[in-house]
């Protein structure tokens, strides 16, 4: 896995990520060229079930600058490519258990294909977010204290 094109940094703060999946994305040529320039935003996006498919909604891939009038729509719905068993598992979790599909990271794989890391997630309540923030602060303070004790 190479350097991410786009990351959803709020995903791990707002949700408990139970399981992650690597999904391909159906893109047009101008979308691929726009991604190659490193321009994308998945912070406000989510994945949803439409029929027996899973689609990425509200992901922003800006229009390619050197394209002609056949450029793509920036926030169109994009189909995610997963194995049928994975799709069925995700559909069951979303519809029966009330889980959410959250995009975590958009990146190029070793073969040069655009991949999306999707997390099967459960929403956090406000007190869970506070607990997460307190734990993160404690880990930071602990690391700072350990660093101070090292060379004295």
From Swiss-Prot:
Q: What happens when the gene is disrupted?
A: Delays the cell cycle during the G1-to-S transition (same phenotype as an ssrA deletion), a 10-fold decrease in levels of mature tmRNA. tmRNA is incorrectly localized in cells missing this gene.
Which UniProt key words apply to this protein?
Answer: Cell cycle, Cytoplasm, RNA-binding
Q: Name one GO cellular component term.
A: cytosol
- Predominant subcellular localization, coarse grouping: cytoplasm
Official protein name in the record? SsrA-binding protein
Q: Name one Pfam family in it.
A: SmpB
Q: What is the lineage of its organism?
A: Bacteria, Pseudomonadati, Pseudomonadota, Alphaproteobacteria, Caulobacterales
Gene name for this UniProt entry: smpB
User: Where is this chain's protein located in or outside the cell?
Assistant: Cytoplasm
User: What one GO molecular function would you report for this record?
Assistant: RNA binding
Query: Which organism does this record belong to?
Result: Caulobacter vibrioides (strain NA1000 / CB15N) (Caulobacter crescentus)
Respond yes or no to whether keyword Thylakoid is given for this record: no
